[in-house]
Curated annotation (Swiss-Prot):
GO terms for cellular component: extracellular region; host cell plasma membrane; membrane. Homooligomeric pore complex of 35 to 50 subunits; when inserted in the host membrane. It is found in: Secreted; Host cell membrane. Keywords: Cytolysis, Hemolysis, Host cell membrane, Host membrane, Lipid-binding, Membrane, Secreted, Signal, Toxin, Transmembrane, Transmembrane beta strand, Virulence. InterPro entries: Thiol_cytolys_C, Thiol_cytolys_C_sf, Thiol_cytolysin, Thiol_cytolysin_ab_sf, Thiol_cytolysin_sf. Residues 1-28 form the signal peptide. It comes from Clostridium perfringens (strain ATCC 13124 / DSM 756 / JCM 1290 / NCIMB 6125 / NCTC 8237 / Type A). A cholesterol-dependent toxin that causes cytolysis by forming pores in cholesterol containing host membranes. After binding to target membranes, the protein assembles into a pre-pore complex. A conformation change leads to insertion in the host membrane and formation of an oligomeric pore complex. Cholesterol is required for binding to host cell membranes, membrane insertion and pore formation; cholesterol binding is mediated by a Thr-Leu pair in the C-terminus. Can be reversibly inactivated by oxidation. The gene is pfo. It comes from the Bacteria. GO terms for biological process: killing of cells of another organism. The chain crosses the membrane at residues 189-202, 209-218, 287-296, 304-316. A motif (Cholesterol binding) lies at residues 490-491. This is Perfringolysin O.
Length: 500
């Protein structure tokens, strides 16, 4: 009887254990299945990472290659050439409006909005992540675990790491900025966005870039971008995509949030913190030397009194906008003295509590294989160059002891609506008229005069060579003053052409 009771008790306990363990096993299997569904689902996404993040800017089919216009005493030839620009930046500029979508560990979609620097955030329940900061001296204290990696929680964790460095290590470790520099002339919105990897609207709004005036050749603009990086914060890359998601999340949940072959998931792997300085150099000069003049100024070449670039600088202004760093430097600086811009760039280039860092760029990776998500920009643009020509004149002077005749001819250039050059031939009304010493006259030339031909001949009185050339010049350059002089005797004539 006792043995029977023991057997019954053991059987009851075994049955209870089976009933208790069954939900645990089922729950564990459910979690594993959900994780596997995420890993296999993301792994099975079919996309070309170069195509899914392709940015096709302007496509130019036709344009007028040349145009000529008169402006006062000048003739301006505008020459246009089609260019193509292809870039694949991996660090994407951060603007204020996307801070909460571009923090370390943030999940995004690789869609059109990402290409346009307006990333779509993938909002689902998350597992904890580790973030790391590269401030010197922290060593083993450079990492922190964030249980619920939202924008607010991650930002708070970064502040905690930075505060720790300021309290413990800032006195023994200096932190000069790592500077990245890029520059480009402005030709179009798509071109400058691709060249500097920045949203053109930022430049338009903060610097006041007038793209219409640039397109109409009314202004020439160069943009400088200085990225001064104080530190970088990175998120640990997952071994499997499911490592990032709460156990309750399934691949179907991700699909409902927008994950697809056309919009595969990404994670922000690192964010650079520091300050960005955008500088606009703008001029109303139409000189072909504008870019060279601006570059000389940037290099701090001593050219303030340069006659070569004087007109350009007198008609130029400079604007700087600082994002990050000391709040006193945030205001827009507009000046005609580039030394003030240099001061803005030089000041506050070291991280401190009074000169805090600001998120300036980020890099994302595809969850499928942790490969870097690079936006592939391709755009056409028109590069415009202008050449100014001024009016000139020919000063004829004859003091020789002989009868002389002159021939002066030139072409005046214009362009038709297709941009083709049209030449109108012109001649001086005094051509081949006998002139005796002393004779002088002035022949005015329009600024669009080309192919200038000057000939002078003397009457020798010799039957076998009645006329002898004293001057015979083709393609005489147009200058303010073309001084043509002839002198001497019939046997020993003299001549010169000088320019000033």
């Amino acid at each position: 009887m006792i043995r029977f009771k023991k057997t019954k008790l053991i059987a009851s306990i075994a049955m209870a254990l089976c009933l208790f363990s069954q939900p645990v096993i089922s729950f564990s299997k459910d979690i594993t299945d959900k994780n596997q569904s995420i890993d296999s689902g993301i792994s099975s996404l079919s996309y070309n990472r170069n195509e899914v993040l392709a940015s096709n800017g302007d496509k130019i089919e036709s344009f007028v290659p040349k145009e000529g216009k008169k402006a006062g005493n000048k003739f301006i030839v505008v020459e246009r050439q089609k260019r193509s620009l292809t870039t694949s930046p991996v660090d994407i500029s951060i603007i204020d409006s996307v801070n909460d979508r571009t923090y370390p560990g943030a999940l995004q979609l690789a869609d059109k909005a990402f290409v346009e620097n307006r990333p779509t955030i993938l909002m689902v329940k998350r597992k904890p992540i580790n973030i790391n900061i590269d401030l010197p001296g922290l060593k083993g204290e450079n990492s922190i675990k964030v249980d619920d990696p939202t924008y607010g929680k991650v930002s708070g964790a970064i502040d905690e790491l930075v505060s720790k460095w300021n309290e413990k290590y800032s006195s023994t470790h200096t932190l000069p900025a790592r500077t990245q520099y890029s520059e480009s002339m402005v030709y179009s919105k798509s071109q400058i966005s691709s060249a500097l990897n920045v949203n053109a609207k930022v430049l338009e709004n903060s610097l006041g870039v007038d793209f219409n005036a640039v397109a109409n050749n009314e202004k020439k603009v160069m943009i400088l971008a200085y990225k001064q990086i104080f530190y970088t914060v990175s998120a640990d890359l997952p071994k499997n995509p499911s490592d990032l998601f709460d156990d309750s999340v399934t691949f179907n949940d991700l699909k409902q949030k927008g994950v697809s072959n056309e919009a595969p998931p990404l994670m922000v792997s690192n964010v650079a913190y520091g300050r960005t300085i955008y500088v606009k150099l703008e001029t109303t000069s139409s000189s072909k030397d504008v870019q060279a003049a601006f570059k000389a100024l940037i290099k701090n070449t001593d050219i303030k009194n340069s006659q070569q670039y004087k007109d350009i600088y007198e008609n130029s202004s400079f604007t700087a906008v600082v994002l990050g760093g000391d709040a006193q430097e945030h205001n827009k600086v507009v000046t005609k003295d580039f030394d003030e811009i240099r001061k803005v760039i030089k000041d506050n280039a070291t991280f401190s509590t009074k000169n805090p860092a600001y998120p300036i760029s980020y890099t994302s990776v595809f969850l499928k294989d942790n490969s870097v998500a690079a936006v592939h920009n391709k755009t056409d643009y028109i590069e415009t160059t202008s050449t100014e020509y001024s009016k000139g004149k020919i000063n004829l002077d004859h003091s020789g002891a002989y009868v002389a005749q002159f021939e002066v001819a030139w072409d005046e250039v214009s362009y038709d609506k297709e941009g083709n050059e049209v030449l109108t031939h012109k001649t001086w009304d005094g051509n081949y008229q006998d002139k005796t010493a002393h004779y002088s006259t002035v022949i005015p030339l329009e600024a669009n005069a080309r192919n200038i031909r000057i000939k002078a001949r003397e009457c020798t009185g010799l039957a076998w060579e009645w006329w002898r050339d004293v001057i015979s010049e083709y393609d005489v350059p147009l200058t303010n003053n073309i001084n043509v002089s002839i002198w001497g005797t019939t046997l020993y004539p003299g001549s010169s052409i000088t320019y000033n």
